[in-house]
From Swiss-Prot:
Organism taxonomic ancestry: Bacteria, Bacillati, Cyanobacteriota, Cyanophyceae, Synechococcales
Source organism: Prochlorococcus marinus (strain AS9601)
Annotated function: With S4 and S12 plays an important role in translational accuracy.
Name of the featured protein: Small ribosomal subunit protein uS5
NCBIfam families (UniProt xref): rpsE_bact
HAMAP family: Ribosomal_uS5_B
Any one GO CC term of the record: small ribosomal subunit
Gene this chain is encoded by: rpsE
Biased composition (Polar residues): 1-15
Length: 206
């Protein structure tokens, strides 16, 4: 039968194991700090590409059993000015929380916009949401963004520099922003249209 080691023998073996030196601990701490800095810098680069603009903040109330519950509603437009834009709505008990929820909601509802070399849109488009209708059409270089209100914010954060927009119907900021998003989502490039119709670009322009 083999002799089982006693507690004193096990303790003596553990005592003989060399512990990490202070120099090694410092090196490990430095490596961990470098990794954390790299991760933070990557996250900052990703977040720096996106811009956020608050279109409207309203104080709303909800009738519950105990009375009225007050909260804030924020309409936020998020975009990277490179062809991606989104509109979000957030509700919270404070303004900062409502804006934060609106930003996260806007990033969940992003739309890709095909941009021309002149930072305009390829074709005319009409979008509607509720009683709001928004008409957007391409413009020549140097025209700028001819739009107002929440429609202008959506177009600017999408990266469009030359465009004409017309608001038809309702004047509410949320409906107009969503109508502009619908109009942008319906845009298609000339190549995609010619591919769907089975004709060349020359035949499409003629």
């Amino acid at each position: 039968m083999t002799d089982t080691p006693t507690k004193q023998e096990i303790q003596s073996k553990n005592d003989n194991v060399p512990a990490a030196t202070p120099v090694e601990q410092k090196k490990n701490n430095r490596n961990d700090r470098k990794r954390n800095r790299r991760g933070d810098s990557k996250n900052l680069e990703r977040d720096s590409d996106w811009q956020e603009r608050v279109v409207q903040i309203r104080r709303v109330s909800k009738t519950v059993k105990g009375g009225k519950k007050m909260s804030f509603r924020a309409i936020v437009v998020v975009g990277n000015e490179k062809g991606q834009v989104g509109v979000g709505v957030g509700k919270a008990g404070d303004v900062i929380g409502a804006v934060r929820k609106g930003v996260s909601d806007g990033k969940k509802n992003l739309v890709r916009v095909p941009l021309t070399p002149n930072n305009s849109i390829p074709t005319l488009s009409l979008g509607s949401d509720g009683a709001a209708n928004v008409l957007i059409r391409p413009a020549a270089p140097g025209t700028g963004v001819i739009a107002g209100g929440s429609i202008r914010t959506v177009l600017e954060l999408a990266g469009i520099k030359n465009v004409l927009a017309k608001r038809l119907g309702s004047k509410t900021p949320l409906n107009n922003a969503r109508a502009a998003m619908v109009a942008l989502s319906q845009l298609r490039t000339h190549k995609s249209v010619s591919r769907e119709r089975g004709i060349s670009l020359e035949q499409l322009y003629s």
